[in-house]
């Protein structure tokens, strides 16, 4: 099994609900280590750059607006198959379709305010981690 890194963002809706600790507990219970973390209030420019891959999609402006509506908690997770493990913990993008016990089923309000973001592949994980955490700010443990 491969040790991987993945980016996770606890979105403004979940931060506002004060469930950061509950979500962190799920990461740790699944064997994922938080090796970098910070709380930030993304600017429109930062959110726009991060989600640039969606720029031509109809939901892009709403996504950028939502991601800048309040603080987010950004973390780099590390562990065996971290990308797939985190995506399993998150559940389906639409919380109505998410399995019971997943982060989105338990904490998300809608397909837009869906509590968390997670990298979907090793290539995107590397780009996303580097976007928020230059190498000197990530510490394996």
UniProtKB/Swiss-Prot annotation:
The active site is at 117 (pros-phosphohistidine intermediate). The keyword Phosphoprotein applies. Keywords: ATP-binding, Cytoplasm, Kinase, Magnesium, Metal-binding, Nucleotide metabolism, Nucleotide-binding, Phosphoprotein, Transferase. GO terms for molecular function: ATP binding; metal ion binding; nucleoside diphosphate kinase activity. ATP binds at residues 11, 59, 87, 93, 104, 114. It is an enzyme of class 2 (transferase). CDD domains: NDPk_I. Pfam families: NDK (PF00334). It is found in: Cytoplasm. InterPro entries: NDK-like_dom (IPR034907), NDK-like_dom_sf (IPR036850), Nucleoside_diP_kinase (IPR001564), Nucleoside_diP_kinase_AS (IPR023005). It catalyses: a 2'-deoxyribonucleoside 5'-diphosphate + ATP = a 2'-deoxyribonucleoside 5'-triphosphate + ADP; a ribonucleoside 5'-diphosphate + ATP = a ribonucleoside 5'-triphosphate + ADP. GO terms for cellular component: cytoplasm. One of its GO terms (biological process) is CTP biosynthetic process. Its main location: cytoplasm. Its EC number is 2.7.4.6. Its cofactor is Mg(2+). The keyword Phosphoprotein applies. It comes from the Bacteria. Homotetramer. NCBIfam families: PRK00668.1 (NF001908). Belongs to the NDK family. Major role in the synthesis of nucleoside triphosphates other than ATP. The ATP gamma phosphate is transferred to the NDP beta phosphate via a ping-pong mechanism, using a phosphorylated active-site intermediate. This is Nucleoside diphosphate kinase. It comes from Azoarcus sp. (strain BH72). The gene is ndk.
